[in-house]
Amino acid sequence: FDPEAAALFEAVVESAYLVANSDGHFDETERAAFEHVVVTACQGAVVDGQIHALIEDLADLLGEDGVDKRVEMVAKSISRADHQQEVLRVAALLAHVSGGVSDEERELLSKLQRAFGLDESALARALAEAESAVAP
């Protein structure tokens, strides 16, 4: 068991969920992309029921704590800059999948970037990488 890898997985998954929900809508495109992130991160070792339970758990945490507290918790769990950049990149990818990055999604990504203590170029890099990944 690698605690650093587990923390990275949890941060990637939660940040993706937070971005997907930042505009108040968790649409089918975002849900499918979120599920793909989870399945890929788990190397296919999860089933639909587990993903549904994970989404419910994340929704409960967001409802109980609010977005700012959840961003803070994600940021506290990741100390390595390369891991922080990866969390931002995956979150930016989720933001791009349903018609581009909304103002709400961009604000949440900015909160993550600031909570990590990264400069604005880190977010710009993450957004550019995500945009090129979803470009036709």
Give the predicted meaning of each segment:
Residues F1-P136:
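Small-residue-enriched hydrophobic alpha-helices in membranes
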